[in-house]
Amino acid sequence: ADSMGVDIIQNCEVTGFDVSNGVIKGVKTSKGNIKAKKIGLCVAGSTNILAEMLNMTLPVETHLLQACVSEPIKPILDHVVTFGAGHFYCSQSDKGEMVMGGDLDGYNSYAQRGNLPTLQHVLTEGIAMMPFLSKLKMLRTWGGIMDMSMDGSPIIDKTHIKGLYLNCGWCYGGFKATPASGWTFAHTIAQDR
């Protein structure tokens, strides 16, 4: 990203936006102001927080999605397995770990720590599909927040504020769709359509 002219500023919180006469002028941050003619909001589960700073209400809710990874085993899975009715997915990493997840906590939250009942549900569904999973030790779990749109469809569009663009509401598919969403979002911003 660096070689393409992108600056990634870590631990830098957005505190507001500079909007004048319906046109975006910049972003206010904990490390100073950044002037820009075009700004894209693509912030996973924090979209509503930033939208509220702009007096916008979006049709998305923030939820926690958990995942876990097992000890490594010999290669057995070269694709992603999903079970929609059970809210479960599984793939195998290059190191042989089984990466699993799928269900979300049943309430809106910005917390990034999971709970055991949700993880148990995911693993129960996984074992029902692939019984060999019951023999594996889980090495770690983690959670991350994401935007969920009401119909499960992502939102990539310009807003009523000239120069401000949205990429949100990806639900379960955000990580898997990141490459395509990046190209689409870049096109939307560059072409303003």
Locate the predicted segments by residue:
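Residues located in well-ordered beta-strands
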Residues: 13-16, 69, 137
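Central helical "cap/lid" subdomain
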Residues: 29-77
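C-terminal lid/capping helical subdomain adjacent to the catalytic/cofactor pocket in oxidative enzymes
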Residues: 6, 160-193
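Alpha-helix/helix-capping structural signal
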Residues: 45-46, 124, 180
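Helical element adjacent to the flavin cofactor pocket in flavoenzyme catalytic cores
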Residues: 1-38
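A short alpha-helix-loop-beta-strand transition element characteristic
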Residues: 58-60, 135, 192-193
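Active-site lid/adjacent beta-loop-alpha segment flanking the redox-cofactor pocket in flavoenzymes
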Residues: 72-163
